[in-house]
Structures are given as C-alpha cells and as structure tokens.
Amino acid sequence: MTDFHDKPNIQIMFDSLAPTYDKINGILSLGLHIAWNNALVSLLGETNHLLDLCAGTGRVALSYVQNYPRASATLVDFSTKMLENVQKRHPSAPFSYITSDVTHLPLPDNTFRLASMAYGLRNLSYPLEALREVYRVLQPGGHLGILELTRPATYNPVYLLHKLYLNLVVPSVGRFYSGNSYAYSYLKESIRDLPRDAALEAIFHAAHLRPIRKRKLLFGTATIWILEK
C-alpha cells in the first residue's frame, strides 16, 4: 500500500487548533514530545539550513536552532495559522516560511542536506507522492528524519494501556482544552490507522529513501526513522 485512507479537511482542523496545539500536545504526551523532538534533532545532526516539513508550531525547528545556534530553517506547513503562530511567538527566530502541501514544494531540486518531518506522516493522504517530492529537494546523500506517533507491537506489555489511552484520554483531554473533540478523535484514528513499520518502510523504499536508522521511543509509542537519498 502506497497511500493512506482519505483524510478529512485537516487543513481547517489544524488552523482551528493552532492557538492551543502546543499546550494540549504537551499535556497529552506528559511533556515527552520535547525529548522526542530533541532525539530527532540529535539523530539528524548539524547543517546550515534545515527544511522542516509539516512544521506545525515550529517546535522541531526551534529545538534545532537551539541545539545548533548557527543554523537556520525553512518551515513548510499547509496551515497558515500554525505558521502565523510561530512568527508571532518567535519573531526573531532565523526562519523562513512556506505555506504549502508537502506534495508540491515550491523549491528547487537538490537544495537541502537535511529535512525533518515530525508528527506529519500519518496526516498525508498520499505519502509516497510527498516523500518523492522530499527526495527531489534533498541533495544526493541527504537525510530526512521522520518522527511519528506509532502503536506498540501487539505482544508489547503496554499495548492495551496505549489502546485505552488513545480511546479514552486523547479525545477527552482534547475536548476539554480545545473544545474540538473531533480533532482529537482524528488524532486517535490517525495513529490507529498508520501502517505498521514494514509497510511504511516499503513506502520509503518506493520513494528511493533508504532507512539507515530507526529508534523506538517509550515502548514503541513513537518512532524515529532517518532516511537517506
């Protein structure tokens, strides 16, 4: 399988979540998303200019320039409100901004040595098309780091706890803090419906991106892949 199921109009949904997105995700992950973002940044290593895809409110890009103070970043997201949130909160950050879908990047071929995509893969209706576009803008030998919320293996002792967490805690907390229970029901479903590792890695290979590192976080509730062009 190279495409995920049809997505609702998540651009409008993420626009509506922009004001509370960081706070809610911090609560839902018990603050672990900060450590996970830092792990992604560490595995990617240093470059002068990072391409941050599905950038959201810019947490990965901010972590990147804090860890590598000489770096700058281009943030790409299809949610105007998310990018406006970054600009408003961090006006002096060394960032440029592009409002665009990952499947149609207005960027030249072979431009970036490093790119990141955190919590965005499962929101793509056409991941193969998007990853081929990332391949196009990466330099030969360049790396894409993907951080995604995933499901523990069924034999994992935390599998049932994680399932209960997704079904009960995520929608309830999202509804309480954002007033948008649908959005966090979608989050639950997007994690549940994300293909398992073997299927995802087949998509990576189909896009000519070779997995060179993989790290499971918190019993497999999140996963980092480093892919090479």
UniProtKB/Swiss-Prot annotation:
One of its GO terms (molecular function) is demethylmenaquinone methyltransferase activity. S-adenosyl-L-methionine binds at residues 57, 77, 101-102. GO terms for biological process: menaquinone biosynthetic process; methylation. Keywords: Menaquinone biosynthesis, Methyltransferase, S-adenosyl-L-methionine, Transferase. Pathway: Quinol/quinone metabolism; menaquinone biosynthesis; menaquinol from 1,4-dihydroxy-2-naphthoate: step 2/2. Pfam families: Ubie_methyltran. This is Demethylmenaquinone methyltransferase. It is an enzyme of class 2 (transferase). It catalyses: a 2-demethylmenaquinol + S-adenosyl-L-methionine = a menaquinol + S-adenosyl-L-homocysteine + H(+). The gene is menG. Belongs to the class I-like SAM-binding methyltransferase superfamily. MenG/UbiE family. Methyltransferase required for the conversion of demethylmenaquinol (DMKH2) to menaquinol (MKH2). InterPro entries: SAM-dependent_MTases_sf (IPR029063), UbiE/COQ5_MeTrFase (IPR004033), UbiE/COQ5_MeTrFase_CS (IPR023576). Its EC number is 2.1.1.163. It comes from the Bacteria.
